[in-house]
């Protein structure tokens, strides 16, 4: 596995990583066959990689056994050039360590490790948590995941800089909702750290201040358009990138009209993918919201 940080200018994981939903059957079981079909569709339609068992994948309501089986099914079906990153984070350090070890042993291309949620550790605690994971992960590339709106805890750039002493800490998903987060990370950590936008609506603004790509929800539906936006920006066709950004804003907003992944699961259903309802305690999208979403999808 590649861990040379000089390669981060050409992001190890690619530019567009889809945070894939976990399909469920009518009975609420994981639909592994549909997960295989969906992941291959995503790869063929703009995604450079697939992120499994993250927020969008409903990791809080998946057992570790289900998460492992899902990874094995998807990874085994995809072309080797498609990176598969698996969520291994937990607010229990020992659990995160064991899950990350298992991801390494199973052949994952990387692990997404979220900031511990609920117990709100201080920065020194965060450093020790991620250090333990990095030490146990051998050369498995790690993507830190900062999403303070869900975790109640913010991973500061100074702490990220310290963590970069570990050769396998290569990237971060920045989902604070603050464009300044990218600027701060770049200023303190330099270009060796690949920063991914964690918000589709902030992808273009974050690209302008140094982000390399996105961990996307909208790419389930508009992966090719997102890819065109990124490469338009990179090639200096900023007006075209801006036009795509503006066209997709209603979709970006609609996909967060309520808690993710409720809207994207409904959007996929409206697009012909029967991925099932979210597991409890999440609930299906209301009929009124579904009508709004359907209108926006038809306008794409």
Swiss-Prot record:
Q: Is Cytoplasm tagged as a keyword?
A: yes
Q: Which GO terms describe its molecular function?
A: 4-hydroxy-tetrahydrodipicolinate synthase activity
Q: What is its EC number?
A: 4.3.3.7
Major localization class? cytoplasm
A biological process (GO) annotation for this entry? diaminopimelate biosynthetic process
Xref: PROSITE patterns: DHDPS_1, DHDPS_2
In the UniProt record, the signal sequence range is none
Q: Catalytic residues per the record?
A: 145 (proton donor/acceptor), 173 (schiff-base intermediate with substrate)
Broad class of enzyme this protein falls into: lyase
UniProt KW keywords: Amino-acid biosynthesis, Cytoplasm, Diaminopimelate biosynthesis, Lyase, Lysine biosynthesis, Schiff base
In terms of InterPro entries, this protein maps to:
Aldolase_TIM, DapA, DapA-like, Schiff_base-form_aldolases_AS, Schiff_base-form_aldolases_CS
Summarize the subunit comment. Homotetramer; dimer of dimers.
The record's similarity note reads:
Belongs to the DapA family.
What is its biological role? Catalyzes the condensation of (S)-aspartate-beta-semialdehyde [(S)-ASA] and pyruvate to 4-hydroxy-tetrahydrodipicolinate (HTPA).
Q: Which HAMAP family match?
A: DapA
What's the protein here called?
A: 4-hydroxy-tetrahydrodipicolinate synthase
Organism annotation: Prochlorococcus marinus (strain MIT 9301)
Gene name in the database record: dapA
């Amino acid at each position: 596995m590649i861990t040379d940080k000089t390669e981060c200018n050409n992001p190890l994981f690619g530019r567009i990583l889809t945070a894939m939903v976990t399909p469920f059957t009518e009975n609420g079981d994981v639909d592994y066959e549909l997960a295989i079909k969906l992941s291959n569709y995503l790869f063929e339609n703009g995604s450079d990689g697939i992120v499994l068992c993250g927020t969008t994948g409903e990791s809080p309501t998946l057992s570790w056994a289900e998460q492992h089986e899902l990874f094995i099914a998807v990874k085994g079906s995809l072309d080797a050039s498609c990176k598969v990153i698996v969520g291994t984070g937990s607010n229990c350090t020992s659990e995160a360590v064991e899950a990350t070890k298992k991801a390494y042993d199973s052949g994952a291309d990387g692990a997404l490790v979220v900031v511990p949620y609920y117990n709100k550790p201080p920065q020194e605690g965060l450093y020790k948590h991620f250090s333990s994971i990095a030490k146990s992960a051998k050369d498995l590339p790690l993507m830190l995941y900062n999403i303070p709106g869900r975790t109640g805890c913010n991973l500061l750039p100074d702490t990220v800089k310290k963590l970069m002493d570990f050769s396998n800490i290569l990237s971060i998903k920045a989902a604070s909702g603050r464009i300044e987060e990218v600027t701060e990370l770049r200023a303190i950590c330099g270009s060796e750290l690949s920063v991914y936008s964690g918000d589709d609506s902030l992808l273009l603004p974050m690209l302008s201040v140094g982000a390399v790509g996105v961990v996307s929800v909208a790419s389930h539906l508009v992966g090719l358009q997102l890819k065109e936006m990124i490469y338009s920006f990179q090639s200096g066709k900023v007006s075209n990138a801006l036009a795509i950004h503006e066209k997709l804003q209603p979709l970006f907003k609609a996909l967060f009209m309520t808690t993710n992944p409720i809207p994207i699961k409904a959007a996929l259903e409206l697009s012909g993918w029967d991925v099932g309802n979210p597991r409890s305690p999440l609930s299906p999208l209301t009929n009124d919201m579904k009508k709004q979403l359907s209108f926006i999808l038809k306008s794409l």
